[in-house]
Amino acid sequence: MIQLWGDSRLRSKNDTILKAIKGESTSHTPVWFMRQAGRSQPEYRKLKEKYSLFEITHQPELCAYVTHLPVDNYQTDAAVLYKDIMTPLKPIGVDVEIKSGIGPVISNPIQTVKDVERLSQIDPKRDVPYVLDTIKLLTEEKLNVPLIGFTGAPFTLASYMIEGGPSKNYNFTKAMMYRDEETWFALMNHLVDISIDYVVAQVEAGAEIIQIFDSWVGALNVKDYRYYIKPAMNKLISGIKAYYDVPIILFGVGASHLINEWNDLPIDVLGLDWRTTIKQADKMGVNKAIQGNLDPSILLAPWDVIESRLKDILNQGLNRGKYIFNLGHGVFPEVKPETLRKVTEFVHNYTAK
């Protein structure tokens, strides 16, 4: 295992977020926004008039530009690589496309263990060189904040692959778990294997933090999570850490009932959505760094409302330490860029030491 937290590997001048994760003293609370690269930026919307999401991510210069924009425009303390959690699925044989207004749509959903056996492994240098080239390009451009790479969690990826797209109830996914454990665990193991290779390649290319998005896992109860999901998550996170001791953030939506399960995992940061306060997480015994958790909808409110909510969350974060400010989900397209800029400035000033 290679230690990435030391000065010898640290490329970023602004290492505030890395210090916060470790519980070290920082000059201010670090800020970044999920989906900060993309939808709310006018420059990005102009690009989208010409290119699809996958077309942008396949062109390292464009992708690096989109990734870098919020760091320049909002002065965030981290950059998050612009790509989709579906990115590693196409190379392994999943026919996926992103449809406007719908999201990922998969034409060959997984139904049997034979479908899983037909999936290939991933060779990131061969299959997703554009992702690695984008990371290297950002590093060469001397990005002055840590770059966050990411992957989808096995359950969330599997739910898309089984349902064929977004779902409200995950009926097909749960049905497979309950009636066909052979196929379910084969799929989990395959997704863990490709995700480890995919994440390790991102770290080797220059990513300094990894976020695992388990967007839909809140659909499961605790008992099912422990049996059907948690072993795969342990294997994924431990597998990454066997190569590099890179900081790992875990985030999901509507999953407050799983906080204790997440706290058991070898992650470094637990991402909260807006439904659970930092105080509540602390009372539940969370001993990781915490990230979150302003309701994204608040950013559409008048500034006095935003400021009031910011103060409440920031005070909780300041009281506990080991805290990163973020939203409780991704930035909405309707949010004005100047609002994000103002939020970052407020967080930096309000928490300045």
From Swiss-Prot:
Location(s) in or outside the cell: Cytoplasm
A Pfam short name: URO-D
Record EC number: 4.1.1.37
Protein keywords: Cytoplasm, Decarboxylase, Lyase, Porphyrin biosynthesis
List of residues binding substrate: R35, Q36, A37, G38, R39, F54, D84, Y160, S215, H329
Catalytic activity: uroporphyrinogen III + 4 H(+) = coproporphyrinogen III + 4 CO2
Entries under InterPro entries matching the protein: UROD/MetE-like_sf (IPR038071), Uroporphyrinogen_deCO2ase_HemE (IPR006361), Uroporphyrinogen_deCOase (IPR000257)
Listed GO biological process terms: protoporphyrinogen IX biosynthetic process
GO molecular function terms listed in the Swiss-Prot or TrEMBL record: uroporphyrinogen decarboxylase activity
Keyword Amino-acid biosynthesis attributed: no
Pathway it works in: Porphyrin-containing compound metabolism; protoporphyrin-IX biosynthesis; coproporphyrinogen-III from 5-aminolevulinate: step 4/4
NCBIfam families in UniProt: hemE (TIGR01464)
Cited HAMAP family: URO_D
Record protein name field: Uroporphyrinogen decarboxylase
Species per Swiss-Prot/TrEMBL record: Staphylococcus epidermidis (strain ATCC 12228 / FDA PCI 1200)
